[in-house]
């Protein structure tokens, strides 16, 4: 579901909870280069948007430099970012034309959720191979 496109407002609620939302003026809107401004709620229905959501993962997309060694391939090295005094997991993901960025981001979010529930597939794999 879309919460915000380019501009995300983040508020700290209580000690450890961050909430992300969108400024009213651009709520439900995304810019799609070559097409223009789209209203996601009107195009895809109310089930495709949400007013706010807890922020527990930051995904940084960067152009892939072609060097395989410059990115964590197993998922064992965790990076964090400070947002309003809260430590939030940061995933830096290399992208290039042809990659399904939506699927990659969804996979990162699901993996993050799985880790919070106590399941770390990367660590399980490392244990299997004795790393």
Q: What does each model-identified segment do?
A:
Residues 2-63:
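Conserved nucleotide-sensing/catalytic segment adjacent to the nucleotide-binding pocket
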Residues 52-131:
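Conserved NTP phosphate-binding and transfer environment spanning the P-loop NTPase/kinase superfamily
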């Amino acid at each position: 579901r879309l919460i915000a496109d380019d501009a995300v407002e983040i508020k700290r609620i209580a000690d450890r909870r961050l909430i992300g939302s969108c400024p009213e003026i651009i709520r439900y809107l995304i810019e799609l280069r070559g097409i223009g401004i789209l209203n996601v709620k009107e195009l895809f229905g109310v089930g495709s948007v949400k007013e706010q959501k807890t922020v527990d993962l930051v995904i940084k997309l960067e152009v892939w430099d072609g060097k395989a060694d410059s990115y964590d391939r197993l998922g064992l090295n965790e990076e964090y970012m400070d947002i309003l005094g809260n430590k939030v997991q940061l995933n830096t993901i290399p992208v290039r034309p042809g990659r399904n960025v939506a699927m990659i981001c969804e996979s990162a979010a699901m993996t993050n959720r799985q880790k919070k529930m106590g399941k770390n597939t990367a660590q399980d794999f490392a244990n299997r191979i004795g790393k």
